[in-house]
Amino acid sequence: MFLALWEFDVKPGFESRFEKVYGPDGDWAQFFRGDPHYRETRLLRDALRPNAYVTLDLWDSRDAYEHFQQQNREAYLALDRSCEAMTLREKHLGSFDEVS
């Protein structure tokens, strides 16, 4: 299993919209579901900083994730651009492989 971990600071007033777009049934998850190697997305909100969120995107493997990004680069970038208005900051926290 592979995990891509992202952190976001969401603009005040955009929390509900952000949660819909980035949640487990949101636009990103629906986009990823086009690939059979995508597993799930989890969205977590910081208990102490209510405008801070992390997303966990789980895939079968790092190769599957990278292949999806390469094959869908334009659509990925277009979706990412459409979400920019909701966030103050987006940071890739890491790419993690499961240790068995």
Q: Where are these predicted regions, by residue range?
A:
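Short, well-ordered beta-strand segments in beta-rich or mixed alpha/beta enzyme
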Residues: 2-9, 40-69
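Short amphipathic
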Residues: 7, 93-95
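Short, conserved charged micro-motifs
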Residues: 13-19, 64-66
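An amphipathic, aromatic/His-enriched active-site/gating alpha helix that lines ligand/cofactor pockets
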Residues: 23-40, 58-93
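Short, low-order "capping/linker" segments at domain edges
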Residues: 96-100
